[in-house]
Every structure is written in C-alpha cells, then in structure tokens.
Amino acid sequence: MKIASWNIESRLSRYKMKTKRAQPEDIVRAISFINPDIMFFPEAFSNKLDNKVKESLDELGYILVPVPYNHKDDGRVWGEFKNLHLLMIYKKEFKKDIKVNTIRLADFRNAIELVDKKNNLVVYGVHLDDRSEKVRIEMAKDLKRISSKRKEDILILGDYNAMHKEDWKSKVLRNSLVRKSFLVLGKAIADKDRIIARTLDMALGTALEVLTKDGGFKDIDQKMRSTTTLKMRDHEFLPSFRLTQIDHILYKFNKKSIKRIDFKSYKIYQDLGSDHRAISINLK
C-alpha cells in the first residue's frame, strides 16, 4: 500500500496565474505516475474542483473526498485562497473498509481523518497554518489530543509549515545573526507578506515537538530531507532546488506492526509542477 502527500498550490482548480505551469491535467498525470493507494492534498483546489479532474480521477479508480478549510478569516479570502479545500483520495477497491471524517483543529481550520478498518490504520491529512507558530502549536495540540483516542496505527500526512528543531537548516535559521540579517532583508525589500519572517518562525521547531517529543510520533524521514522550493505559484522563474523540509509523514505504530513500514521506500519526487515535492511511503 502506497500512501502519499503533496501540496499542489490549488492547482486542481482553474484560475488565472502569471504562468501556465502544472494545470489540473498535469496534476492528474502526476497522480497517475505516483500511483498511490491513498493520497492527501493540502491546498487541493479553491472554489470548485475542475470537472475534468473528477472524471479523470474516477477513470483512474479513485474516490475523492474534498473538505473545505473553513479557516478563520486571516485576510486571505481572494484568488486561490477563496473557499480553499483539502482533498483525500483513495482507490475504489478499499471503499468498503474506509471511512473518512472531518476534524477541526484549534477552531481554526479543518483536517481529514481516514480510518481503514481492514488495515487497522488511521491516516490524518493536515495543513498547519503558515503565518503563526502560535496557531500551529494549538493545531498540533488538538491533533495530538484527537489522535490519542485511536487504538490503530497512525500516519499524519501533510504540510506542517514547520521544520524539525534538530534539522541543521533550521539551526542555521535560528542563529541570532542569521535571523537578524534576514529580518533586515525583509524590511529592505518591503516583504509585505512577511515571507521571510514566517519562514524563520517555521524553523523554531516547537510545533512539531508537540507531536514528536510530547505525542510520541516519529518522522518517516529521519534524514530530514528538504521538500519545498522557491519555484512557487506566480514566481515560477525561480529555481526548483529543494530548500527546507516542512512536508512530513509522521507515524505512531505499535511494536508488532512497525515492521509494516518499508522505510527504504520513502520517496521525495522530482518537480511535478508545484513548489512542494510529493512524498510517499509504502506499507507492507
């Protein structure tokens, strides 16, 4: 069983962009290439899922479960952020064994809970806030509380907007001189969206510690390899090399079933058209 996650920058809906990279049909081709049994998409689409996407994924054998973010208004209710949706897909052959629920984290944003009875597995799909470490921590606390009630093996997939505190890259970004220098740069270039400051906060590592240090979860990728690039929506002239790891697959399995995880199968995919790289893991 292959389980995957990929932040696709709302590319399953059609809206005007400055560039034409990775339209909905390109994302569908990428999904076919990855060939997951279960896959989660933060920022799947805004407003409306493209009809051709529904048809194409149905032909590929998938059931689609879209869930609206319903996030508290943080000033971004325009363009690709308007009526933003999460999406979980799974193969039709698992239909009789799977139930999908919507959960609420920190009364801020929805997340998805997939329960696979046959495989004694719960898969959470989450997208933690990208603007506030405080909100990320509260969302992580809620996720820890909700998941602690489950007896099954657990995977948490998604875009955490958070790095591990032990990651050498986050250590560099937490260096006081480096941090001050980047903040000065942000002011100099009039960084109105606080992209630099927000990235620095993602390096604090405190949100992930709620789940790892306090919640007993571990990251599938202990090497902490990067998953995001600068080649983001409307800035696709920027390079595609990977910079930071904020997409994670966390796990909590019991001692007997830990052998189900094929750690060597963990994969970070090539550039498939988003600023995030898709990631996947196989279960035996």
Predicted regions and their residues:
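Short catalytic/ligand-binding loop motif for oxyanion handling, primarily in non-cytosolic enzymes
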Residues: 11-14, 47-50, 73-75, 132-133, ...
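Active-site beta-strand/loop signature of hydrolases that rely on acidic residues for catalysis
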Residues: 3-8, 30-50, 123, 142-169, ...
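Surface-exposed cleft-lining segments at the edges of enzyme active sites
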Residues: 12-15, 125-137, 194-195
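N-terminal, active-site-proximal structural segment of metallo-dependent hydrolase catalytic domains
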Residues: 1-59, 69-83, 284
